[in-house]
Amino acid sequence: MAGSEPRGAGSPPPASDWGRLEAAILSGWRTFWYSVAKERATPTASRKEAAEETSALTRLPVDVQLYILSFLSPHDLCQLGSTDHYWNKTIRDPILWRYFLLRDLPSWSSVDWKSLPDLEILKKPISEVTDSTCLDYMEVYKMCCPYTRRALKASRPMYGVVTSFLHSLIIQNEPRFAMFGPGLEELNTSLVLSLMSSEDLCPTAGLPHRQIDGIGSGVNFQLNNQQKFNILILYSTTRKERDRAREEHTSTVNKMFSLQSEGDEQQGSRYSVIPQIQKVCEVVDGFIYVANAEAHRRHEWQDEFSRIMAMTDPAFGSSGRPMLVLSCISQADVKRMPCFYLAHELHLSLLNHPWMVQDTEAETLTGFLNGIEWILEEVESKRAK
C-alpha cells in the first residue's frame, strides 16, 4: 500500500503553477470520470453495486467529487480503491499520481537501484499522461515510495531472517567497507569525527592482523550492540591540504587515483586506483561513497562517476558488491539536493551492482544507521548465496 513521507519545508509552487496543475488534474479526472460513467449506465448485477452507485459521494456534481478526491493522500486513495471495483479503477488517474510523484520525490530520504524512477516518465507532457496507453504512475509511485519499500522489507519471510542469522554465526570476520568521497573532506562538519564520537556505534581501532600497508586497519563499529563492521576511511590527500582547500573553497588533487585519459564535456576522465587503494578494493565487502549534497556546491559529476567506477571495478574483488551513497550535508539547516536528483547526476543507474542513496547529516548522523543497516543486509544476502 502506498503512502507518503512528510514533505520538506520547501515553499509551494507559485499560484499560477498551482492553478495550471489543479486544472490539469480536474480535466484528467473529468475525462476519466465520464468514460467510467458510461459503464455505470448499464444495469448492475447485484443490489450491492446498485447501492454503491447511489452513495452520497457519487451523487455529488462531478467537479465537486474531483475536488474532494484531489485532497486525499496516496495512502487514502489506496484505501478508497480497495473498497470496490469502481473506486479501484477511478483512483488510478495518471495525472493525479504523476502529481504525487513530482511532489513527494524531493522529500524522500532514500532511493535505491530498484526504485529510482526514469527521468523520462517525469518529463512527459500532460497530453501524453492522459493517453490510455500511458504508464501506470500509481505503480511507479508505490515502487519508489520509501514507505512501500519498508513495508515489503518487513514482510520478508521468517525463514530468510533465520537463515541470515545462522549464516552470520559462521562468519569469522566482520563485514569491511571502504569509505571515500568528497563529502568526507568538503563539509564544515566532519562526518568521521561524528562517527568516532558516537556512543551508539562504539568505535574502536581495527585489529592489527587486518592492517593494510599504507592504509591501516580501519575502525571497528557495532550496530545496535550486535552487528560489527569495519570501515577503512580513505582520504584523497593529506589533512593539511584538505583543510586549506576547504578554507579557500578550492579543489585538491586526488592522490587515490591516477589519470588514464582526459575527458571532455560529454565524457569524464578515466581513472584507475593506485596500488595501495587497489589492495583495499580487493578485501572489502562493499563501498560507502560520501557525496557532498549541499545545494550550493559545484560538482564534477562525470569525474565523480569515473572514480566510483574505478573503485568498484570487479577486477579488484568479487562482482556485485553493494555501494551505499551517503547524500551528506553538514547540519539540518543546510539546503540539500534531493537524493533522487543526486542519484541521476552520479549516473548510478549505470552501475552493475546494488546501491542505495541515503540522506545523511554529518553533525547528528541522521540517516547513517539506516544506510548501514541496508549495506549490512546486502552483504549478508550475498554471503548466504
From Swiss-Prot:
Protein function: Substrate recognition component of a SCF (SKP1-CUL1-F-box protein) E3 ubiquitin-protein ligase complex that mediates the ubiquitination and subsequent proteasomal degradation of target proteins. Promotes ubiquitination of cyclin-D1 (CCND1) and its subsequent proteasomal degradation. However, it does not act as a major regulator of CCND1 stability during the G1/S transition. Recognizes TERF1 and promotes its ubiquitination together with UBE2D1. Promotes ubiquitination of FXR1 following phosphorylation of FXR1 by GSK3B, leading to FXR1 degradation by the proteasome.
Record's subcellular location: Cytoplasm
Gene designation: Fbxo4
Gene inactivation effect: No visible phenotype; mice were born at the expected Mendelian ratio and were healthy. The half-life of cyclin-D1 (CCND1) is not affected.
GO molecular function, one term: ubiquitin-like ligase-substrate adaptor activity
Keyword Acyltransferase: no
Quaternary structure note: Homodimer. Part of the SCF (SKP1-CUL1-F-box) E3 ubiquitin-protein ligase complex SCF(FBXO4) formed of CUL1, SKP1, RBX1 and FBXO4. Interacts with TERF1; this interaction is prevented in the presence of GNL3L. Identified in a complex with CRYAB and CCND1.
Phylogenetic placement of the source organism: Eukaryota, Metazoa, Chordata, Craniata, Vertebrata
Protein name: F-box only protein 4
Source organism of the structure: Mus musculus
